[in-house]
Amino acid sequence: MVKIRPDEISNIIRQQIEQYSQEVKVVSVGTVLQVGDGIARIYGLEKVMAGELLEFEDGTVGIALNLEADNVGAVLMGSGLSIQEGSAVKATGKIAQVPVGEAFLGRVVNALARPIDGKGDIASKESRLLEGPAPGIIERRSVYEPMQTGLIAIDAMIPIGRGQRELIIGDRQTGKTAIATDAIVNQKGSGVICVYVAIGQKASSVAQIVTTLQEKDAMRYTIIVSETADSPATLQYLAPYTGAALAEYFMYSGRHTLVIYDDLSKQAQAYREMSLLLRRPPGREAYPGDVFYLHSRLLERAAKLSDALGEGSMTALPVIETQGGDVSAYIPTNVISITDGQIFLSADIFNAGIRPAINVGISVSRVGSAAQVKAMKQVASKLKLELAQFSELEAFAQFSSDLDAATQAQLARGVRLRELLKQAQSEPLSVADQVATIYTGTNGYLDDLAPTQVRAFLSALRSYLATSKPKYAQIMAANVFTPEAESLVKEAIAETKASFK
């Protein structure tokens, strides 16, 4: 028979009493009234906050968006197929956060910053709010450093600065994504971290972008956030904020970042779908009344930070798709008013074989020459003027056959300058090469060549400068087009013409 030892029992009881905690954990629990189409209506979560994360019985996470008198409308971050009427829902007391850090570079993640590239988990110690506050007025400084894209048409005439928001707008299949990926490829060696956010795109398109960036060795400094067309509307709506949070980590550590949102039209459509299912009153084009705030709070997070905060920057290139070139539709006009300029791509120019298909006439950068290096300023102003005059003359020349010699010469120059702006995809040019190219065109050195020979000649000239005039690149490292650099370019033009067939 087992002998009972009172002292041992009293010790155990004493230990249990010492370990007892009076802390009471209060959990707010509700019940699902209705679920479907990625929306759940919940009864009982009386103290839930707007935007608070909710946890369902099956592990699905939702966000409380509609706080009504007798129920809460939540959007689901998943299919929610195993959620039933009467299921319990728990309020977490947390606002949506995503992990951030250096480990994300070179990876493809979803809107919850979880890897989807099959390369294993991402180790991260830090996290940031999905919808963090934008920097205030005192925390910013004016944009003054250039963000080179490697495209002559943009860097010369629509310059983008670090910390700017420049909209890329145009119809489908006009080369919007190509400009964005070229900008990423051109950041190689500049220390700029790139974040590409794919919203509602085909999985094959995203795979193609990943392949292009890998071939160009650009994935080392790039993070891709992807929510494809088959993703729930909630995740498509959240993806841009995830991209901004990942970029903010680097911006606040004094680094420069470039974020591409491709495209915000799809995000607006996902938000419209959620809002209509939540029975929010529709406005123009059935979008909810706060669709402007949807984009403004995202794009205001792009900034050039002050000296006190480390002078980091986040440059945003949002993409908007238009229908039939209509830039006066609701979402395009909203985003045009939020951004610091727009690059307008035209289907007519694209179909005419001019790539990139930028309509220079209505494209603008509101930062302007403040974001250009001195060498580019020296040669670009003449290019802008000559192309503007050419556009006017070209329209006039269609109605008149007998033109004087000066007008004919100006038209011939304009045709060659237009050829000069053409560039193949994923072949960005350095500032030195761009300056030499523009100088050659604006000073009449292409006038005696046939328009079909222009691109081949310029390519030969750039190769000749690199191999036979290495001093030119050394001088241009200071980003100033000196008389010595000019004479080297003149020599190279003459020598290339002598051997050019």
Swiss-Prot record:
Catalytically driven reaction(s): ATP + H2O + 4 H(+)(in) = ADP + phosphate + 5 H(+)(out)
TM stretches of this protein: none
Cell compartment(s), UniProt: Plastid, Chloroplast thylakoid membrane
Site (Required for activity): S363
GO molecular function: ADP binding; ATP binding; proton-transporting ATP synthase activity, rotational mechanism
InterPro entries linked: ATP_synth_asu-like_sf, ATP_synth_asu_C, ATP_synth_asu_C_sf, ATP_synth_F1_a_nt-bd_dom, ATP_synth_F1_asu, ATPase_a/bsu_AS, ATPase_F1/V1/A1_a/bsu_N, ATPase_F1/V1/A1_a/bsu_N_sf
Annotated positions binding ATP: G170, D171, R172, Q173, T174, G175, K176, T177
Keywords annotated in UniProt: ATP synthesis, ATP-binding, CF(1), Chloroplast, Hydrogen ion transport, Ion transport, Membrane, Nucleotide-binding, Plastid, Thylakoid, Translocase, Transport
UniProt-listed Enzyme Commission number(s): 7.1.2.2
Entry membrane topology: Peripheral membrane protein
PROSITE patterns: ATPASE_ALPHA_BETA
Entry GO terms, CC: chloroplast thylakoid membrane; proton-transporting ATP synthase complex
Family indicated by similarity: Belongs to the ATPase alpha/beta chains family.
Summary of subunit composition and partner proteins: F-type ATPases have 2 components, CF(1) - the catalytic core - and CF(0) - the membrane proton channel. CF(1) has five subunits: alpha(3), beta(3), gamma(1), delta(1), epsilon(1). CF(0) has four main subunits: a, b, b' and c.
PANTHER family in UniProt: ATP SYNTHASE SUBUNIT ALPHA, MITOCHONDRIAL
Protein's job: Produces ATP from ADP in the presence of a proton gradient across the membrane. The alpha chain is a regulatory subunit.
Protein name: ATP synthase subunit alpha, chloroplastic
